[in-house]
Amino acid sequence: MALFIDVHHTAAKGLDAQTMAEVHSRDLAIQDRYGVRFLRYWFDPVTGKTFCLSEAPSMEAVNAVHQQANGTMADEIFVVYEGQ
């Protein structure tokens, strides 16, 4: 399993924390189907940028969860490594 940061450029524009939590909970509800584990997310309601940290078998699996749960896909996905 690898760590991924995925970026949605405008998905959160104008959304509040409660709405983002609901969006995230839909990802969590189906993540096991794809072998994905979402760990954290950050968002900026002004710019709409959202960043999701996940552990997953592939970038495609991360996007499959987002697509199935919320009808959106990440604009960018990066493999990341945790520093010490």
Where are the model-predicted features located?
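An amphipathic, aromatic/His-enriched active-site/gating alpha helix that lines ligand/cofactor pockets
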Residues: E55-Q84
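Short S/T/G/P-rich N-terminal loop/turn motif that feeds into the first structured element of a domain
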Residues: M1-R33, R37-L39, F43-G48, V65, ...
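Short beta-strand-to-loop capping motifs
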Residues: H8-T10, L53-P57
